Amino acid sequence: MLFYCRFTWYPGVSRAMVGRRLIQQHELGTNHPERIKGWYTLAGGGAGFMIVEAEQPHEVSEIIEPYMDIIAWDVHAMAETPYEATIEQMKKELTMGG
């Protein structure tokens, strides 16, 4: 399962603070880079999102909890919506329903 993990640094948090924590957690092995399928920072910094692959939500929590005192998180499970299959399904539903 994929999870969309939006993040925003708390006010007063610096790049150095985030950098130190990132390296600390990396060295402890808690970042699980094998689960991070994408990591994007928004223009201007201090915010962005990650796409994390995990079987269970608690596996995502294991990654983000060590950052919760300096970063706010908003996490949502994601489901892929294949475009062509979705169009065909919508056409079928509209034909049957109306």
Question: Which role fits each region the language model picked out?
Answer:
Residues 1-98:
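Conserved, structured core segments of small domains
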